Amino acid sequence: MFRLTNRLALSNLIKNRKLYYPFALATILAIAITYIFTSLTLNSHLDDLPGADAIKMVLGLGLGIVALSSGIIVLYANSFVMKNRSKELGLYSVLGLEKRHLFSMILKETMIMGFVTLLLGIGVGALFDKLIYAFLQRIIGESTGLVSTFQVMTIPIVLVIFACIFSLLVLVNGFRLLRLNPLQLTKDGLKGEKKGRFLVIQTLLGLGTMGYGYYLALSVQNPVTAIISFFLAVLLVILGTYLLFNAGTTVVLQLLKKKKSYYYKPNNMISISNLVFRMKKNAVGLATIAILSSMVLVTLVGAASIYAGKKDYLASAAPHDYTVTGTNVDVTSTQKVMDDFLSQSGNQVNRKTEVTYLYFGIKEQEKNKLTIFSENERKVLPKSVFLVFSQATYKQLTGKDLNLTSNQVGLFTKNKILKDQKSVSINGQNYQIQESLNDFIKGKVPNIFTTIVSDYSYLVVPDMDIFKESIKGTATTQSTYVGVNVKDPTHEAKKNSDLLDKLTDKEMQQLAGQTTGVPGPNLTANSRYDVEGMLNGFVGGTLFIGIFLSIIFMLGTVLVIYYKQISEGYEDRERFVILQKIGLDDQQVKKTIRKQVLTVFFLPLIFAFTHLAFAYHMISLIVRVIGVLNPNLMLVVTIIVCGVFFLAYVLVFALTSRSYRRIVSM
């Protein structure tokens, strides 16, 4: 019997190759991608790249997601394969094979499939490893080179991950055999799905959960809380999608059946009857396609937007080659650090900016009346932030004189309410808005709050000392900024950056013992070299992961579509043969098939685009935290991604639909 199960295992894989080809291809690609992610995460050469810590963090996170996604896709593909082999397994049981023999046969099939796919997957991963490493270097802006990235631990990690996945396959298939008798096995592949219960309640629940998920996505305004709300919204939308496909589609089909003028037409009757016959299974497949498609769209839109917007963020976050920023310190401290740096590094200055300003968060707003957080509320995250500059500083930055008098201010604001106001009240002090200003600090002074809040304002006052006195006792912070552009910013950039950090730390040690009556003094130094390296590492790594996660999700989408079309083709073939025998001609068969395929085609796509539309606001807030500050750029990226995905989706469905029509027409 041992030899018999060996021969059967091998012959079954050959006979069922049409079912196993997509399964094997998907598994090989999943293994290859997991191998590449593992190899890159362990690659010692990453330490030589700018932003190495950010790259490793993102790759490590991506490895976990890839491993989980691979497991889900392999399990899903296995369920389709086993469903279509139910009749075959039942026949073996009727012919005398016991369940332990069937289990032994399936175990050997899984071992053969696992060995072959692991061998090929690791081979493909190793083959493209160097090329992918060069691709990662190119994305993060480094010179490409085919550096060997093989790590000893890569193969054991991949083997452990997929050994767990294939072990789970064996357990799932074994449990399937244990709970079904031979008669059930022979009929399992042919039986229709049971009509669900409480369909109307499920439909209403689906609408409610999806609606609340959409509400969460649209109502969040704070980028930090958006990340938390995003996961809750995703879970609600996924649940709502499955409920609506499972129950909502059935309810709609039942309503169409009751509409006699529509239902009692040959094409409509056959299509609707086929969908109703197996709606539960059909609904799960369609919902899965919709969710996977949404994942592809959201991942690509987010990653591509972050990558496309990095130049804008760099210009905003690092307007100068070298900067020193101090909070609650005298301007002489920041000047001293920068002067010592320029003296010791020998850099020649092209442009130098020295600015002192205040910033504070708004606790309450009633039209144009604003209240600042009190001194003991500094740790509260504000919804709106003000940066305050003196009239002299404004002239220094722009070359223009506002000629403000007492109680007059100039204002640039992102606050929608304040844009229409002629005056503003801050902690009970009224000011007339003399002039509405443009963003006068862009490219000159970094605003650290642009990635945290979308509601920020720049206020220009005639006298800074008088203004500070009017808001005494509030959670206000004074910031001093010194930035320089040098003649040759690339010359010894790393060495210069380290020198600036060293001088800043030295000055901080001298300031540590000072008492100012406000939160302790702080000095930070930055170089465009460091900021750009960290940004390229994080953004490039994010795009890299986004691309490969999209491949994984698209792979899952293609698999579900393919197996769904194939399994439904075999199920529908016998019914179409019967219909042809009772008078349905070939043209009507093709028309009916086309109608059914188009219905199945559009539903997941409509849901996916709808999910993306409602998630767009939340995605924009999340990528804002990472530095995407241009909403128009994100919109263009989204349109391009949707267009490319639509074409890919149409191509996949066109190819799989041909298989469906060919099976049905046999």
Language model regions located:
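N-terminal Sec/SRP start-transfer signal
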Residues: 1-31, 195-200, 209, 244-293, ...
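Short cytosolic juxtamembrane segments of multi-pass membrane proteins
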Residues: 3-7, 179-193, 570-574, 661-666
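Hydrophobic alpha-helical transmembrane segments of multi-pass inner-membrane transport and secretion
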Residues: 18-45, 53-90, 110-124, 202-208, ...
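Short helix-loop junctions at transmembrane helix boundaries
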Residues: 39-53, 122-155, 211-228, 603-666
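Hydrophobic alpha-helical segments
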Residues: 112-256
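Alpha-helical transmembrane segments and their immediate juxtamembrane interface regions
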Residues: 154, 231, 235-254, 311-337, ...
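Basic-flanked hydrophobic alpha-helices used for secretion and membrane insertion
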Residues: 313-314, 320-325, 331-555
